[in-house]
Amino acid sequence: MGNCRSKQESHPICPNTQTPEPTEAEFRRAAVNSLYGRYNCKCCWFADRNLINCSDHYLCLRCLNVMLRTSNLCNICWKPLPTRISVPTEPTAPSE
């Protein structure tokens, strides 16, 4: 029963190991107001500050780090996660 081995073809684990192009997202310190209120992290639903735009939703930095540890795809939209973050210069005082 378990003594004979079946012929198995040797398949490489990752035949096409290509590094995906880094995707860039914009960092938001405060969430943008929308018609239905403030945006939140779509993963934990608690964070409304320090959000990263991921295709059609926002993720907080904590959830983004957790997702990047396991995979390079988003668990919500199944698109590549942003790996580069661009921080726009935000004014600290109103312009005169």
UniProtKB/Swiss-Prot annotation:
UniProt keyword annotations, A-Z: Host cell membrane, Host cytoplasm, Host membrane, Host-virus interaction, Lipoprotein, Membrane, Metal-binding, Myristate, Viral budding, Viral budding via the host ESCRT complexes, Viral release from host cell, Virion, Zinc, Zinc-finger
UniProt xrefs under Pfam families: zf-P11 (PF03854)
GO MF annotations in UniProt: RNA binding; zinc ion binding
Family: Belongs to the arenaviridae Z protein family.
Localization annotation: Virion; Host cytoplasm, Host perinuclear region; Host cell membrane
Protein purpose: Plays a crucial role in virion assembly and budding. Expressed late in the virus life cycle, it acts as an inhibitor of viral transcription and RNA synthesis by interacting with the viral polymerase L. Presumably recruits the NP encapsidated genome to cellular membranes at budding sites via direct interaction with NP. Plays critical roles in the final steps of viral release by interacting with host TSG101, a member of the vacuolar protein-sorting pathway and using other cellular host proteins involved in vesicle formation pathway.
GO CC terms in record: host cell perinuclear region of cytoplasm; host cell plasma membrane; membrane; virion component
GO BP annotations, alphabetical order: viral budding from plasma membrane; viral budding via host ESCRT complex
ZnF bounds (RING-type): 41-77
Keyword Membrane: yes
Record region (Disordered): 1-21
Protein topology in the membrane: Lipid-anchor
Organism of origin: Cupixi mammarenavirus (isolate Rat/Brasil/BeAn 119303/1970)
Protein name (database record): RING finger protein Z
